[in-house]
Amino acid sequence: MADPKGFLTTGREVARTRPVEERVRDWNEVYVPGALLPVISKQAGRCMDCGIPFCHNGCPLGNLIPEWNDYAWRGDWRAASERLHATNNFPEFTGRLCPAPCESACVLGINQDPVTIKNVEVTIVDKAWEAGDVTPQPPERLSGKTVAVIGSGPAGLAAAQQLTRAGHTVAVYERADRIGGLLRYGIPEFKMEKRHINRRIEQMRAEGTKFRTEVEIGRDVDAAKLRGRYDAVVVAAGATTSRDLPVPGRELRGIHFAMEYLPVANKVQEGDYVAPTISAEGKHVVVIGGGDTGADCVGTAHRQGAASVTQLEIMPRPGEERSVGQPWPTFPMLYKVTSAHEEGGERVYSVSTTHFEGDEEGRVQWLHLVEVEFRDGKPEQKPGTERRIPAQLVTLAMGFTGTDRANGLVEQLGLELDARGNVARDESYATNVPGVFVAGDAGRGQSLIVWAIAEGRSAARAVDRYLTGASTLPAPIRPTDRALAV
């Protein structure tokens, strides 16, 4: 184990963010580089070698958390990296973007602050890159089998890397102009700089994975013909259909889905645009949706120079501590203040948008809302609470409803969907079409990055078995597995 008394003698410390007045002037990551290095070994030493490490249960990847905590405490960073990469293809992604359900399940968290697992994870992998310990792992021999992966988000990349390393010839198809999917254009630079994606792509290229950008399967290439060219296909196209808000005034200019707004800001950072085509500069911004995507819109609006930012959520404000209905080790829905919220803006809970109001030129100017209260699980408007707030830019960040059907991919392959609009699959990630598998949000629905990577790894094993009759690849989860909850 790590330090036998660490959890008794050392308090929890988390990564420190840069001052607000500094970071809102740039798009760099909000955390101070290397801020935890002097204390990270002691933080890893707080891991208490509990009899049953529930952090394993909280993490769908099955990360070997006590093991790499022990190595980090001892200063054996190469061994820590090896154990970390044994279960996770991209720990620098999860270490920056995952909400850390492993920490919610940490046994120490029953009566103390949990171990800073996420901070230890990202420190291990960053040090591994700096030391040159992250290298390509090309296969020893090729199988002669070919696989097409549709989509280059975390699920697609994980599946592609696992299958390439198993000896198959893999091509990843991405409809955008760069590889990365949601990681590339949906995650702001201040949460994860894209250099982390770029170096992983170079690693994968060196291993033999092929990438095809600006190719939309179903529109540019017939999906059925693609299936005929490859021995297997993995659909990892995500759940990209945004939930809309069909209220009067929705057609006004200045109202955008979050996934219209955020990619434009990211393209500016990539150097594609001098200035964003959708900008919050000098505007009163309203973000509808209280989740992480909404917070990303808030932080982006701050950096673009918004006059004001208001985030609306129809649900009541969550509590700050676990309730009896969210006991340990479940992943609780708690009130949290992200780095974007630290930077300013107002958060309003228990409200519903009734309609938008525009000017004579058809541009949105006001958002009308009303307070709601829930009865029998349904929101009911409270009479007399109607009001309007200025809104010159509105972003809709209310989640996603399923995989994209507009490009013809689903129909051309003849894929069946489940009741939630996701691609249906069996216990082996196989769809109703022989040789076609599905991984990530396309099959699971909107979820977390850690689940996407776990699905990509698990689907890769299923594909490997389909192609060769057996597989030594790991499969951390089944398609029906869900987060530990009540």
Predicted segments, located by residue:
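Ferredoxin-type iron-sulfur electron-transfer modules in oxidoreductases and energy-metabolism complexes
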Residues: 23-43, 63-96, 100, 111-141, ...
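Glycine-rich FAD pyrophosphate-binding loop
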Residues: 168-184, 309-319
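A conserved FAD-binding loop/helix module that cradles the flavin
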Residues: 294-299, 304, 439-473
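FAD-site-proximal beta/loop scaffold in flavoenzymes
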Residues: 251-282, 375-446
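N-terminal Rossmann-like dinucleotide/flavin-binding domain of flavoprotein oxidoreductases
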Residues: 81-88, 101, 120, 183-231, ...
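Feature captures the FAD/FMN-dependent oxidoreductase FAD-binding
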Residues: 79, 141-142, 146-150, 198-247, ...
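Active-site-proximal substrate-binding core of FAD-dependent oxidoreductases
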Residues: 320-323, 444, 464-486
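N-terminal Rossmann-like FAD-binding beta1-loop-alpha1 element of flavoenzymes
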Residues: 146-171, 293-304
